[in-house]
Amino acid sequence: MKREILVTSDGSTTIHLPDLDEQYHSKNGSINETYHVFINSGLKLVSAEKVSILEIGFGTGLNCFITYLEAKKVIDYVGVEAYPVTPEEVEKMNFIKVLKAEKERTIFEKMHAVSWEEKHQISETFSLLKRKQLFENIEDEDAFHLIYFDAFGARVQPELWSEEIFRKMFKALKENGILVTYSAKGSVRRAMLAVGFTVERLPGPPGKREMLRAIKKL
């Protein structure tokens, strides 16, 4: 499938799939979306001193890298990705420049260079395990404080936004765990509610009116 590098409205890059008319990050700003959806609406709400995070769709590593930049605590990060991006695509991402994070360049490069299926200590306070796995094969239980649900949109891959998948997400979270996603589709919200989540509609990132935050309240 054809893949192109696209510059989004905040100046940061994303990968565009023209055959699907879909992007890895919002055309209205890759970095803006990460901060709004995953950091400000997710990470900043977790009170634990050591935070376990599951990312559904590791992709370009942007959410992981910004989590590293913004975390004021110990992070245990698991990124799941069925189809990893290539080293050539990673090199074309301009996140370091736009974030003015030249001092952390080696961290971003290390996140992509480390092997899959093994836990690596990226820094003293940040560990990373990358799993090459289909989302429907996730079987974690009571393991995570926070899930970044960043799969391709329901228009393109509706099977990833089903009750079956969100039931797996519910099981994977600890009690009072949080799932955040850029999507606000009614069908997605209903699927979340059906498996037991408490769901909030929140103001969306640039270009989107709303987003969803789901909490596992027992």
Locate the predicted segments by residue:
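Rossmann-like AdoMet
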Residues: 1-51, 69-99
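Conserved S-adenosyl-L-methionine
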Residues: 55-59, 81
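A short glycine-rich, Lys/Arg-flanked "PGG" loop and its adjoining helix->strand segment in the class I
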Residues: 160-175
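A short SAM/SAH-binding and catalytic strip from SAM-dependent methyltransferases
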Residues: 145-159
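Conserved beta-strand signature within the Rossmann-like core of class I S-adenosyl-L-methionine
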Residues: 146-148, 175-183
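Glycine-rich SAM-binding Motif I of class I
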Residues: 61-65
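Core SAM-dependent methyltransferase catalytic element
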Residues: 195-218
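S-adenosyl-L-methionine
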Residues: 91-141
